[in-house]
Regions:
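C-terminal catalytic histidine-bearing segment of alpha/beta-hydrolase fold enzymes
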Residues: 82, 89-148
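Mobile cap/lid helix-loop segments that gate and shape the active-site cleft of serine hydrolases
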Residues: 2-4, 33-71, 77, 104
Length: 148
């Protein structure tokens, strides 16, 4: 799938939109296997069905195209992942799967899985976790600029 995300209009065309690093805070990364074997529902629909206003059985290509795990590439920028063990919206197996797939592809990655962390909230956004994120991004920036 070739999607043009750059655009061709405006005064920004000389600027790069290359992503130099990414922070994943409890993100869904595989919409085709989101519940990791645990049935999570929102009425008659799973959280991903509600998000996409569809069903995997009806539009599998839609779910595949919106799943980050299908785009992992050894040239991807460094990624830091934070995903709480008690996330009841996006199961933390999503973060663990992302971490393992990024490592297997040779992408620089770090991950933190707070034992009491949910889908956001104080157990996730601790000073320690925020400092880990800042440190990670600073290191990427410094390496990119040749400072390290």
């Amino acid at each position: 799938m070739d999607i043009d995300l750059e655009g061709t209009v405006g005064n920004h065309l000389g600027e790069s939109s290359t992503v130099n690093a990414a922070c994943d805070w409890s993100g869904p990364v595989d919409l085709t296997a989101m519940d990791c074997g645990e049935h999570m529902t929102m009425g008659d629909n799973s959280p991903e069905d509600v998000l996409l206003n569809s069903k995997l059985s009806k539009e599998p290509d839609k779910y595949l195209s919106l799943s980050a795990v299908n785009y992992i590439d050894p040239n991807d920028p460094p990624v830091i992942i934070f995903h709480g063990d008690k996330d009841n919206v996006v199961p933390n197996c999503q973060g663990k799967k992302f971490f393992e797939l990024l490592k297997a592809a040779g992408v620089k990655t770090e991950a933190t899985f707070p034992a009491e962390g949910g889908h956001g909230g104080p157990a996730m956004y601790t000073e320690e976790n925020l400092q880990k994120m800042v440190h990670f991004l600073d290191n990427v920036r410094q390496k990119r600029n040749g400072s390290l």
